Amino acid sequence: MADFDVIAMGAGHNSLTTCGYLAKAGKKVLLLERHDYAGGGAATQQILTPGYHHDLHSSVHIMIQANPLITNDELDLFKKYGMDYKYSDVPHATIFADQSALMTYKDLDKTCEGMAKISQRDADAYRRFVELGQSMLPMVMPGMYKPQPPLGALMAMLDSSEEGRVMMDMMQRSSMDIINTWFTHDKIKMHIARAVSENLQLPDELGTGMGTVMFTALMHTYGVAQPWGGSGKLSESMVRAIEATGGEIRYNSEIKRILVSGGKAKGVELTTGEKIMARDAVIGSMHPHKIRQFVDGVSEPVLKRAENASLAAFSLFVSHYDLREPVQFRTAEKDVEKAIMLTLCQHESMADMQRDFDALKRGELTDLMFSAGNDESKTDPTRVPKGAGMWHSTGFAPFNLLEGGSSRWDDIREAYGEERQKQQGKFVSNLNSDNIIAHKFYTPLDLERNSPNSMVEGDVHGVAPYFYQSVGHRPTPDLGQFKVPGIDSLYLVGPSMPPAGGVVGAGRAAAMGMFEDLGMDFDSTFQTGESKSKNTVKARTQAPDDGAVRLFDENDAELMTVDSIDTQDDELVVRGKTFGTMPLTARLGPGDLRRAAKMALSPAKFMTIVKMLFSKD
């Protein structure tokens, strides 16, 4: 007999998100985690000296800022379970080799003032670029945290308007195409290209251009944040929410396989041999390359397409340091200390940077290393003992080395990490033996070992962010709706799934799909709540009184504005805009109108409509 409604493989932040929604709706959930901590890619641990709290993977929370999980506090993480974000006025900064610095402030005017000191032309272009991206956000963001449409259907919709075709164009271009079109100065180009490449995408990779537009727009609209106490505090608040609603998390519990019978997922078997059954569903936090390992009965074409999902061209080398005192930057620009994302740029030109990106693709270790990092205790003293400091650095590196393959990382880990430390010393004056208490290096191979079922070949975002692996085709068209064809009641979550890797809260979309399949009403279960997020928006209450008809989604975000309803021949023609800016014309013929009337005009619905006509907004 099943003891749980839903069983989840893994307790990463995506599994926690999905199970949090299910648990709040009354489902009894069990999460089985192979580690002795929850969070997966959003985890904070004392890995070296007691009192120093390091983020194991993700550190910066960007895409999740617009998620109703946060903006509407749908799981009461802020209200009840201790979640709290710190926002910085400086989402991103770059220190260059000459110790000059360029800041992306959340304030667009202030950002442009700084850029104007380098290039007035580029500062003006940057303002227009951000405004273009912000005009697209209403088209993109409302659907980001729901099940995604098929790629072909989205393209057909975009191709129906001029604004949509602009988006299509950017989606298919490379970041470098877009950066070169808009900007001229190498420092500004490198500043933007380096920030966008944190998504593990090469600047000249076709099909990644839209990320460049969205990334800059998001920083100036929603900002960039870190949880107080570390990235893992998000996961810890989710654990408390699940346990408070009757859910259970078991640690040091590794799943061997998903139990399938009659084409339906029934439960799981642990590596200990224990079997646990689920009444309603099983959630698998697994990479598409790993489905064959865990699930029997999946058709060979589906498996082969899953195993052909493309990975990022490079991975990360991560360094953690416990310091006696906070880091001291060599640059005179003090605002870099506020930056949540801080790039240390050794390259003198965009051409030099591009050559080293090309080398990464070939599996080469570059002489000038890509580095980013910061002392997170400068803005969050809870991360370290009083008066101490820390250094958390990431840098791009290939998983499969041209010389020696991935296994060579075990041989060169310390030497490579020490060279990275030496190069970072060009920017930080006290990253040395006098100040370092302890350190730990994670190679791309170590990242895979830490999360073998999600971060294959060290791809911390699951799969590459390419155009053909976007929206409902991420990671493949078969799997883009969080389901595995031919296996009922099995749902997939994790960084490989839509809309993107990183801390997005993508498990919300998976939960919406599960609610529908289980006959549950997601919309009525999760109403808008109060939140400590700075990004809470209620579109309905802010809509102008301009005579237009507006349609809103379940989170009170505007979906469509109807500007006019006319007749043409024997059709009703509805004109307006979707998501605030995209023109839309819809035509209803006689048959469509009869069917609509039949849907709307039952006696009960008719009386409701009459009452609505005489009610106040």
Q: Over which residues does each language-model region extend?
A:
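N-terminal glycine-rich phosphate/pyrophosphate-binding loop and immediately adjacent elements
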Residues: A2-P138
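Rossmann-like flavin
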Residues: A97-L206
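A glycine-rich dinucleotide-binding beta-alpha-beta segment and adjacent secondary-structure elements
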Residues: H185-L202, T366-N374, N430-P498
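Helical element adjacent to the flavin cofactor pocket in flavoenzyme catalytic cores
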Residues: T216-A265
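Mid-domain catalytic core of redox enzymes
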Residues: K256-R383
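Active-site-proximal substrate-binding core of FAD-dependent oxidoreductases
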Residues: V260, E516-R540
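Flavin-binding catalytic cores
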Residues: P326-V327, K361-T366, W409-R449
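A conserved FAD-binding loop/helix module that cradles the flavin
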Residues: P495-F515
